[in-house]
Amino acid sequence: MTPSTGSPTPSTGSSRPGVPTGLTVHRAGDRFRTATRWLDSRHSFSAGAHYDPANTHFGLLLLHNEDVVVPGRGYDEHPHRDTEIVTWVLDGELEHRDSGSGELRRVPAGGVQWLGAGRGVRHSEHATPSGDGVRFVQMWVVPDEPGGDPGHAVRDVAGPLAAGEPVVLASGLARHADSTVLPLRQSMAALTVVRLGPGAVTGLPAAPFVHAFVARGSATPEVPERPGPDVPELGAGDAARIVDDGGRRLTAGRDGAEILVWEMHSGLGAGP
């Protein structure tokens, strides 16, 4: 897969030798795809049968899938370990059950779920049998340390999201330690969602790695080094990956935008 780029010429000022700074656009159509009778999944990084050695992760983000699942179907029980899993539900309702509590939990649209796999957990995820199925974005990050007890939590943020301000969904950053956001056992990462009206502007965090995914609508990133018509617009399913160049802004298009933003203050090894 070859990403389309909306980035300036790589800067020589990166603190990671060989890693270009600036903004790179990865288009929705460049994602890997897995399609079955019950699932349509788009993978931003290598996943399952799809492998690109140049696109295995970004920062601490190991997986970023957008899944559409038909009613009553889904992922049967399967194992995870040493992974922090965050799921954002866009449409419909997701049913989740794990081996920790055995309790069936439902996550509605506008809801976020965290599953800390710890030393090992088994879980299942299905669309509710009624309705039109479910669409969600699932994201994995590496934890600070392996092992530990599995954990699970759900939060509905549909109300705060409607206000148009950024809502922190899950975080391990010290500045969020006393807040009501879902925990993340990765002290260098946080996930935020913002729903913007037409023409509204939001700032992106100043962090070594920023991943901004447009889940709905469209948005145009601030690219001072490429002013005018050459600035790339991000449509639904597109993502901006930004390295060592934080503090940019995004302006929503005429239909508004819903954007998921990862702020990461570390990466895996020396690479992106």
Annotate each PLM feature.
Residues 1-272:
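Jelly-roll (double-stranded beta-helix
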